[in-house]
Amino acid sequence: EPEHDEPPPGEAEQPMAKPGPVEFWLLKLALIDRDSTSWLEAHLDLGWVTHPAVRKIVQQHFSLHVENPDAGMPELLGILSSDAFKRLATEAVADGRTIPDPAKQLKDIVLRLRNQFIEHRLAGIQRELAGATEEQLIKLIAERAQLKELTRHPLEPLAGA
């Protein structure tokens, strides 16, 4: 099975869309603040990350951290097979500015990503309600209530983390 971090043939020349600022900062903080990697892995659902390159780089960062907690950027760049991913990861850490309280900023970003994901899903549920059967209505309304309740709580470790 081919790796999914290589663009399909014919798309290799097309530039990758830049991630939005929230996901770019997620990537930056994930790669710079290695002390927060375990916390991030326990609290971030990669499904909340919409940019495929950011999601893949963070996923690879987590995998590398499990294998070698002392691994840094050179090792990460060594396992990223896409040049576009390598450029994005390098760009995220390149400016070298000191970031005040990176752990707090990372928590704020993960909370924001979670809430954006929930808002997007709530909008999807609202659209689905129109044509739903009675059985689907019950499930959708229950999911909507569960998501709304989740937004009232602070970030907690994900199930299984």
Question: Where are the language model's segments positioned?
Answer:
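Bacterial replisome coupling helices
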Residues: 62-161
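Non-catalytic protein-protein interaction segments used by genome-maintenance enzymes to assemble
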Residues: 1-69, 89-95, 119-122, 153-158
